[in-house]
């Protein structure tokens, strides 16, 4: 098993550390999501409770036994390879803060830190509500999706800066 640690180009202030504190659970999640984006992996929520959250690399785990024999709807292989990278965040009710209780940075797969690849990873595909509203208005006005994408591309500096695809817009 190869162990891949974070890219040496990531500044220490962006790397999660044990006992690192946050005012809210959402703030801790956004911090880890930003780190994942810089490092080149996608994040999934594994376990939750009132006081804790486990956020894992999306390549964590394996297919459940028997699933590999089922007829898939589309022909694609599983991305899950048992990656051990995760963070566990806990709430300290006395101090009214959230903190990283466990941090495992090592991955067992190659990371994809290039912005060109990261923007298509599920946890990083987030659009602003205003953009969704503009696409909805154009769609209701009968503007084809491709034309709407071209207009938005001109307005907002090109598709290379977006974290979504034409298919994402179509599916919204």
Labelled PLM ranges:
Residues 123-126:
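Short, cationic low-complexity segments
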Residues 45-53, 61, 66, 145-172:
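Electropositive nucleic-acid engagement tracts
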Residues 128-142:
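Short, amphipathic alpha-helical "recognition" segments used to contact nucleic acids or chromatin
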Residues 1-121:
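Short, conserved DNA-binding cores of transcription-related domains
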Residues 18, 138, 159:
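Short, flexible active-site loop motifs that bind/organize anionic cofactors or intermediates
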Residues 81, 143-144:
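Short, motif-level signal for alpha-helix interfacial/capping segments enriched in acidic residues
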């Amino acid at each position: 098993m190869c162990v891949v640690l974070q890219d040496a180009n990531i500044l220490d202030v962006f790397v999660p550390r044990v006992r690192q504190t946050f005012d809210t659970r959402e703030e801790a999640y956004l911090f880890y999501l930003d780190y994942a984006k810089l490092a080149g992996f996608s994040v999934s929520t594994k376990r939750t409770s009132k006081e804790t959250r486990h956020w894992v690399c999306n390549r964590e785990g394996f297919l459940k036994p028997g699933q590999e024999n089922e007829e898939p709807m589309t022909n694609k292989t599983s991305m899950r390879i048992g990656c051990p990278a995760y963070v566990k965040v806990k709430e300290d009710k006395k101090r009214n803060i959230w903190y990283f209780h466990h941090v495992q940075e090592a991955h067992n797969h190659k990371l994809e830190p290039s912005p060109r690849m990261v923007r298509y990873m599920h946890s990083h595909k987030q659009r602003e509500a205003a953009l969704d509203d503009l696409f909805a208005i154009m769609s209701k006005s009968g503007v084809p999706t491709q034309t709407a994408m071209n207009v938005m591309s001109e307005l907002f500096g090109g598709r290379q800066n977006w974290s979504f695809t034409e298919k994402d817009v179509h599916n919204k």
